[in-house]
Regions:
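Cytochrome P450
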Residues: 1-451
């Protein structure tokens, strides 16, 4: 099929877009076809939500699934007792109909808490919950503040070398959460950049099968090296604790589960925060009036973080859950064993939950419902408090020190990440502008606009 023959995003091959609602006698609409390049996230979310609370979708490789797209339907689906995370319920995978190198395989098959249910899920989740306890996260605040200040110290020189511009995603939004989670987990510096690159490849939806298989193999190899380094020199970190659980006589963790847990902690522990910070900076630069509200004390940095999570969720469509029986979701029956996406991007702008102006970025918004961007129920992200803390500290320090910071290109020209699972810009070129120095960078919660 040539590029000219390719279907428009949102339309299965051989069909044409149709914005009009079907009449009662109309045949079912074709499954929604995701744009694997990650382009048009906002338009995709709008169309998915308009089609209904549960929408048939076509995933890469022609695999059929569903997406749950509206806030209340998604909230209920995420806690439904007859919805599973264990891929043994994934009918097409179980029956051998998923080809090798399928780009979404890792989401279904990684051995960890995101693919387990019941007692197994609680067992695999426990180490992460302990490592990310409220007391542990609160104790990390000074370290996050110091790292933030160090990274901001380097921005003027980087911008000077770039003719006044710098890629804020690469220079600030990435290294901050990667350093924090690596220190918490026990990942030596030599492994961090490669783990970031590989975790990006395994969530890409444009990767070819051979490259996907190679990336997964290398990711397991590098994580094995991380484990070997900690076995040789244990420390007060999560990896050392996981190794101890794996090596004890009544091993509470298998070697595969150890690797899978590390993969999830490293990937989710930095990528979501990286995208959250990137999206928040993009939104504030595009909506300077909202930044002014924070500076005037009419909103705080926690409000910015929460509104970014709702309005521009770092995770757009998260794989997978599987009904264990045919399940009616808002009038649509999802067949047993179907892979289902949690469409946080669509649910975050649901007018039924957030009002008729749900598409508007408004840091003073006080919704009556809880945001779902970090999940809901037993599988809610255990790293959410740390991600929120990092983002609040990063945004406050960034815009305090560089009050004139702005995008170096029009927002519409920002290139998306090559995936429909995650949602962010692949680069964030900015002009930092004047540097007012380190005054007010102590992170005090009593200062104006503190988070």
């Amino acid at each position: 099929m040539t590029e000219a023959d390719a279907p428009a995003p949102g339309t299965a091959p051989g069909s044409a877009p149709d914005a009009s609602p079907p009449s009662p006698s109309s045949p079912p609409s074709p499954p929604y076809l995701f744009d694997v390049t990650g382009a048009g996230h906002r338009e995709a979310a709008q169309e998915l939500r308009a089609r209904g609370p549960a929408v048939p979708v076509q995933l890469p490789g022609g695999v059929l699934g569903h997406a749950v797209t509206r806030h209340h339907a998604l909230r209920d689906f995420l806690t439904h007792p007859e919805v599973a995370k264990d891929a043994s319920h994934f009918a097409a995978l179980r029956e051998g109909r998923i080809p090798p190198g399928w780009p979404l395989t890792t989401f279904a098959t990684v051995d960890g808490m995101t693919t387990a249910d019941g007692a197994d899920h609680r067992r695999l989740r426990e180490p992460a919950v302990k490592a990310l306890s409220p007391r542990r996260v609160a104790a990390l605040r000074p370290r996050v503040e110091r790292l933030t200040a160090e990274l901001l110290d380097g921005l003027p020189a980087l911008a000077a070398r770039g003719g006044g511009t710098v890629d804020l995603r690469h220079a600030f939004a990435y290294p901050l959460p990667m350093r924090v989670i690596s220190e918490l987990i026990g990942v030596d510096e030599e492994f961090r950049d490669r783990l970031h690159q590989l975790s990006g490849l395994v969530v890409s939806t444009v990767i070819d099968p051979e490259a996907a298989l190679a990336a997964n193999r290398e990711l397991v190899e590098v994580l094995g090296q991380v484990v070997a380094a900690r076995r040789a020199a244990p420390g007060d970190d999560l990896t050392s604790a996981l190794i101890a659980a794996c090596d004890e006589a009544d091993a509470r963790l298998s070697e595969r589960e150890l690797i899978g847990t590390l993969l999830l902690m490293i990937a989710a522990g930095h990528q979501t925060t990286l995208d959250l910070i990137t999206n928040a900076v993009r939104a504030l630069c595009a909506h300077r009036d909202q930044l002014d509200l924070v500076r005037e004390g009419r909103a705080d940095w926690a409000d910015v973080v929460e509104e970014t999570l709702r309005h521009d969720s770092p995770v757009a469509h998260f794989p997978f859950r599987y009904p264990t029986r045919d399940l009616d979701v808002g009038g649509t029956v999802i067949p047993r064993g179907t892979p289902v996406l949690a469409s946080y991007a669509a649910a975050g702008r649901d007018p039924e939950a957030y009002g008729p102006d749900a598409d508007r970025f408004d840091v003073t918004r006080r919704p009556a419902v809880r945001r779902l961007s970090f999940g809901h129920g037993p599988h809610v992200c255990p790293g959410a408090p740390l991600a929120r803390l990092e983002a609040r500290i990063a945004l406050r320090a960034l815009f305090t020190r560089f009050p004139d910071l702005d995008l170096a290109v029009p927002e519409a020209e920002l290139r998306p990440l090559p995936t429909f699972v995650g949602n962010s810009a692949a680069e964030l070129p900015v002009r930092p502008g004047r540097d007012v120095g380190t005054a007010g960078q102590d992170g005090s919660a009593t200062s104006p606009g503190a988070g």
